[in-house]
Amino acid sequence: IDKLASQSVLFNNAHSNVPVCSPSRASFMTGVHPLSSGIWGFGNALKQETFINSKSIPEYMRENGYMVFQSGKVFHSNPKNVWDDKGVPADYGPVAYNGKKAIGHPSNPAEMAKELGPLDATFVPLSDVPKIDSSSSGPGYEGWRFSNWQTNRHFNYVSESERDLLTDEMSAEWFEKKIDWIKQNQNNNQPFFIATGFIRPHTPLVVPKKYYDKFPLNKIKITEKLKDDLIDTKFRENLKETRGHKAWRLLSQGYGSEEKGLKIFTQAYLASINFADEMVGRVLDALDKSSYAKNTIVILFSDHGYLLGQKDHLWKYNLWEETTRVPLIIRQPNNDNNAGKTVAHPVSLIDIFPTISDYCSLKGNTLKSEKGKNPNGFSLKPFVEKPELETWDGPEEALTVVASWKSKLPEKQHLAIRTDRYRYIK
């Protein structure tokens, strides 16, 4: 990713519009802000009127003559017949299994799995193969298991050289083959759009041991916590324990101290990032070795950030900086003069759709019916071509929302505004 950034323009103040997976993806794939669509929680977007009546990026590109392909984790609510090829299904695993269902890994605190579920409570090397004894909750099971109901099979692991591939490895391999396939089957130079969604560092943080070995526990630097960091939040006085605070408490209790627990979790998180970084490298290598490198726009970003102990939290879906801020890198061919430059202006993920539309000169209505909404974002192309730009057509701030759960009215949700200097949380 550092290599890509050195060839690209890096947005240092880019933010998710809703910092949790499903609604974030519904938002950036349509360009419609959550406050406009009403999608800021965990419901199925395919049952939401605005979403199903607004065109997504692949739908709009397909109408404009593009072949559209995806693999891995791109949509949570994937509309039918959108892609020409859907590639590898998103599977978060492998996970421990008791013969009936996924459970927490025995090397991690049992109470975390009980309270948070097996995904968020699993962070071990792939070589730590679970062996679950029989109990009243299941007949027992030895080995890993894929987590997706569509996959629903044993994950084979004998050694690092003799095992099944993780979903992200399969997606990287799929991309390498897809580029070759396009070269062999492309008709009349038909343009293409490929969305490759890597799952890590989403939990479970299970990757090959070699990535863990790069980050020895005795060299891990954990989050430096501010004194009295919760004073400004009113959590203790007014709110029930959040999931993020619960995860932090259970991690600390499970390992006997905040420092030990956070070191172990941070090691797993860094290992997963390093693993994902290598998968990104495989995709870029395949593209750069092809004849398409010089006329393909590359956009790399994440759906949200993550708190690692800040504000006594270990999760996403809140309005603090570390959770809303995301990596955003755009590589434009023949833009060498701006390679490695950064943009400090606040932008957000709803700007992805208009940016792609601008670069690809897409035309036509972005609505399926009058019940849909047009993209709320703005093209980032002016920043890519002039990173020092001080003004643009878009807003001067990035707007993020988190559900209040007490009302469906947009004005009743929790909001954060990020400017070039400040963050205001309501």
Please provide the spans of the model-predicted regions:
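Formylglycine-dependent sulfatase
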Residues: 1-426
